[in-house]
Amino acid sequence: MTKVVKIGGALLENPAKAVNEIRSLARGRTAIVHGGGMQITRMLERTNVPSTFIEGLRVTDESTLAAVCAALLGEVHTALIQALYQQGLPAVGIFGVVRAQKKSGPWGFVGANVRADATSLNAILDRGKMPVIPTLAMGENSLLNVNGDETAAAVAVALECSELLFLTDVEGVKDAAGAVIERSNNPNELLAASFVSGGMIPKLKAVKAAMEGGVGLVRVGRTIFEGAA
């Protein structure tokens, strides 16, 4: 069985601690997808470029895309792989296995219809290695900034995974009263709820895509999604 673990930028502020969490989950064939939202925002702040989000997705012009590439590939990716190696995990950084189309609308260089190259990823997994994938996609004419949750779902579907695990700094999906929803088989119902907003929107869309693509179990923090989407 194969699983995908997606780890967000907030947890990657401390790579060693993040790897301890990954280590407890990475039994058997495991691929890692990482974001870097906090690191991207910090890099943009250094150059006085504002961060704008629409429906939980970062609006990405040329200046922002340059910062995304620098933060993800030059900072986060390198630090995470180093931390994985130090913990004895057989990490292999891989870039170029995610493709996307440019998303229509006001987002700029943001990818949609994300898909992953299962052949290349399986070649790494079959050697007993752990592919580590940043959330940058190859577009038709340029690199594209892609949502980490959507990327993780695409990788999980391509690899026909049994599990997709989102490691996040939030406890899980919360209801209108602020309590964590422990189990659900209906991400559509939650997407329609008024209490779901911000970054949880793309996360639940990713849960939906993964379940519809055949992933049997998806976990967001303490919230477990299982069954038909």
Residue ranges and their predicted role:
Residues M1-A229:
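C-terminal catalytic "cap/lid" subdomain
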